[in-house]
């Protein structure tokens, strides 16, 4: 569906940018993997932990908390968990205020968080016509 395509597009955009030496050369291998992991799961709880009818505005916080709650099942250290969670929490960028004007989500602060936001943002732009066939990106 649409969410899976969006996630695949975000990851592909990130991968292509990170493979570019001018852009990707500014990140270590570990940083690249952690940003890709954050993109893989950034919208995983978009409809809540229990499937809800509408998108949860706080879904980045739900996903981040899910990672923290399940960190013992991962082979990541505390610093890596923090890195991933901060990228997930801030992936919405400037769309961090709820319908009542409350600032719910943090803004991206560092280059890693801004990179994850950029890839998420670009994958949602309709003018970037990423072709899919059977939910797979077509070259």
Regions picked out by a protein language model, each given a short descriptive name:
Residues 17, 53-54, 131:
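Single-residue recognition of alpha-helix boundary sites
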Residues 13-20, 43-50, 69, 94:
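Amphipathic alpha-helical interaction surfaces
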Residues 28-52, 63, 88-92, 120:
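His-Asp-centered metal-binding catalytic motifs of divalent-metal-dependent phosphohydrolases/nucleases
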Residues 1-34:
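Alpha-helical phosphate/pyrophosphate-handling elements in metalloenzyme active cores
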Residues 7, 11-14, 34, 59-98:
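Histidine- and acidic-residue-rich, metal-dependent catalytic cores
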Residues 25-26, 75-138:
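Histidine/acidic-rich helix-loop-helix segments that form or flank divalent-metal centers
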